[in-house]
Amino acid sequence: NGENIAECEFKHIHQDIIETVRENMPEEDILVDLAELFKVLGDQTRIKIIFILFKEEMCVCDIAELVGMTQSAISHQLRVLKQARLVKFRKEGKTVFYSLDDDHITKIFDYGLHHIEEMYKR
């Protein structure tokens, strides 16, 4: 919100802390994949879809109606979410139902939503 970032007034390296963190740092490819995950989550339409699926398993037609977009546009977004393993689907007759892929996605979304809601309360 425009506040300045505080900086150290003198340079002093805390080698013990640096080594502890360095030893526990994930591999570079894992960090790249994590950044990609957050990129996928960085789209408002995909966040709406995740919110919808956070609440209820749903078919493409219903998601499109809720979001106010075409089924083909929603299908494209669902494809992106599926490639990132954020959503999964199941078929029931001619209808395809989407849901969040696993509990991790639910937790990520729930924590993010709570974080934003707390910011609005300040």
Protein language model regions, located:
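Short intrinsically disordered, low-complexity coil segments enriched in acidic
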Residues: 1-3, 47-48, 118
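N-terminal leader segment of winged-helix/HTH proteins
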Residues: 1-41
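Generic structural signal for conserved hydrophobic packing positions in ordered secondary structure
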Residues: 42, 74-77, 112
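Alpha-helical residues within the helix-turn-helix
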Residues: 65, 76, 82-83
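Beta-hairpin "wing" of winged helix-turn-helix
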Residues: 82-92, 99
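Conserved segment of winged-helix/HTH DNA-binding domains
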Residues: 99-122
